[in-house]
Regions:
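Regulatory N- and C-terminal appendages and interdomain linkers associated
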Residues: 1-24, 28, 113, 323-329
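An alpha-helical support segment within catalytic cores of ATP-dependent transferases
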Residues: 7-22, 109, 134-142, 149-225, ...
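Short strand-connecting beta-turns/loops that link adjacent beta-strands
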Residues: 45-47, 109, 238-240, 288-291
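Active-site Asp-x-Gly
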Residues: 61-64, 221-225, 230-287
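An acidic site on a long C-lobe helix of protein kinase domains
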Residues: 140-143, 255, 287, 291
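ATP/Mg2+ or Mg2+-diphosphate-binding catalytic cores
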Residues: 190-200, 294-329
Length: 329
């Protein structure tokens, strides 16, 4: 999908500034999949390419909700340059491959909204590579495991968004598990209001959530986690390195949160990323919480005009059934 004429003109000026050399923008196409920001591939007249991230309200398919702009909530939407740059800097410092930044514009020099132009990595994402050639994906998975280990080893004494914690701030809640429980209860209420199957099981799901949370023991150090590191959020560069994208939600949190998401998204392909020492009580709580989140979130997104509706409805349906399976007698 091409951008609006006004957006294209803004991207043209930014692309010239980012890439230099007298180049002119020849084409700009929105890349499918982005739901919180506009992601455009920019093609210049000499075939040089780059990616533009545009954090504009018109590019965000998610309905607004109270607390969206409260960055002390680790799960508030990851929007804007401040979060992106803080996450990018932390991952680079840890040796995790991310797209190189070519230009940032937070002052409206090119666009009224926050804008970043970054390196284009036009090859496959990890999910496509795993489906096409598992043997070729094996070394990429091994390197991804190394990146995850570097993130796991870097600890902070408090949890929250990297931009907040690295800036000396603190986050709401008493602990990771309390924040997750509160969020899961909200997701449960929202899903129950939209689907009678969840409504019928609401009391049992709430009882299970509270019981699992009560089993979690306190923790005082937190690792770096991406939070949504599915195979579509890992690109593969020309030499086979995994490249993390959609990094704005990067936070210090329980590492189990990351591994639950990886298990859900990768299924059997998760095995090369398995690690020892994960807390089984946290894994149990976070698994149910994420199943509820992946039910309520897609149903909420479908209230708007998100284009890939069939896929999003399928995600909600699958995770709804998985959540119910977790309380089956």
């Amino acid at each position: 999908m091409a951008p609006r004429a006004e957006t294209r003109a803004q991207l043209a000026g930014a692309a010239r500034a980012a890439l230099g050399g007298g180049r002119r923008l020849e084409a700009a196409e929105r890349i499918a999949g982005g739901s919180k920001k506009g992601v455009y591939r920019l093609v210049m007249d000499d075939s040089t390419t780059a990616i533009a991230y545009l954090w504009d309200d018109d590019e965000n398919y998610w309905p607004t909700a109270e607390g969206d702009d409260d960055l002390t909530d680790p799960f508030a939407p990851g929007l804007g340059l401040d979060l992106f740059e803080a996450a990018h800097a932390r991952l680079v410092a840890l040796g995790v491959r991310v797209p190189a930044i070519r230009l940032v514009d937070r002052d409206g020099a090119h666009c009224p909204a926050d804008l970043a132009i970054v390196e284009d990595l036009p090859g496959e994402n990890l999910g496509d590579l795993l489906a096409r050639d598992p043997s070729a994906a094996a070394p990429v998975m091994a390197r991804l495991g190394e990146s995850l280990e570097a993130m796991r080893r870097h600890r902070a004494p408090t949890y929250g968004k990297v931009a907040v914690v690295d800036g000396g701030g603190s986050s709401l809640g008493k602990s990771c598990e309390s924040v997750v429980l509160d969020r899961a209860l909200r997701d449960l209420a929202e899903a129950a209001s939209r689907d009678p199957r969840i409504a019928g099981a609401r009391d049992r799901l709430e009882e299970r959530l509270r019981g699992l949370a009560a089993e979690v023991r306190p923790r005082t150090e937190y690792a770096v986690v991406h939070g949504e590191l599915g195979p579509d959020h890992v690109l593969v560069d020309a030499v086979g390195n995994p490249v993390a994208i959609d990094i704005e939600g990067l936070m210090y949190f329980d590492v189990e949160w990351e591994h639950v998401f990886l298990r859900i998204r990768l299924h059997d392909d998760y095995r090369p990323l398995e690690v020892d020492g994960l807390d089984e009580d946290r894994l149990a709580l976070y698994t149910l919480a994420q199943r509820l989140s992946l039910t309520a979130g897609p149903l909420r997104l479908l209230d708007g005009d998100f284009p890939d509706r069939e896929s999003m409805a399928g995600i909600a349906e699958h995770n709804l059934n998985q959540a119910l399976e977790l309380i089956r007698p």
